[in-house]
């Protein structure tokens, strides 16, 4: 399985937010099940933006961005075609559309997010980290 991990899931772990333990468990289980976890380069950029706004410390921001790189198995680049397709997409949010298209291009099998409503038009199944862990436990 190749799983696209959405930005909000990565931020939960990196900023030790409400779902920190569940996301930690998700990555632990993904490793045990030898699943490939992916994020888009855009997500890594967005993480840097959010962190810099909160931390006001560019060095600390870069270190945490490196942690994000280390957590995932693969960084997915978005193609120019995906960018254009996202503009014409019927998905209202450009970034969500781009995530979905990038996941398809990278042959991901599912999207992992806490904002499932943002991915209602996804051709791929969409799960929270907790739901994915439940699937693995069966």
Task: Give the label of every model feature segment.
Residues 6, 12, 46, 93-96, ...:
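Acidic side chains
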Residues 15, 82-93, 119-126:
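Generic structural signal for short, solvent-exposed loop/turn connectors between secondary structure elements
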Residues 24-93, 97, 101, 137:
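PIN-domain endoribonuclease scaffold, especially VapC-family toxins
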Residues 2, 36, 75, 111, ...:
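A residue-level structural signature of the nucleotidyltransferase/glycosyltransferase Rossmann-like core
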Residues 1-39, 54-59, 121, 130-138:
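Short, well-structured N-terminal submotif of metal-dependent ribonuclease cores
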Residues 8, 79-81, 112-114:
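Short beta-strands and strand-loop turn motifs
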């Amino acid at each position: 399985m190749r799983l696209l991990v959405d930005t909000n899931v990565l931020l939960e772990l990196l900023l030790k937010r409400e779902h920190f333990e569940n996301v930690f468990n998700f990555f632990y289980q993904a490793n045990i099940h030898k699943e490939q976890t992916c994020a888009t380069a855009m997500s890594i950029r967005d993480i840097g933006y959010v962190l810099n706004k909160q931390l006001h410390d560019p060095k600390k921001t870069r270190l945490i961005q490196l942690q994000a790189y280390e957590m995932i198995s693969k960084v997915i680049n978005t193609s120019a075609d995906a960018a254009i397709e996202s503009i014409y997409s019927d998905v209202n949010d450009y970034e969500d559309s781009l995530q979905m298209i990038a996941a398809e291009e990278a042959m991901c099998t599912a999207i992992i997010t806490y904002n499932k409503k943002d991915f209602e038009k996804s051709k791929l199944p969409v799960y929270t980290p907790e739901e994915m862990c439940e699937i693995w436990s069966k």
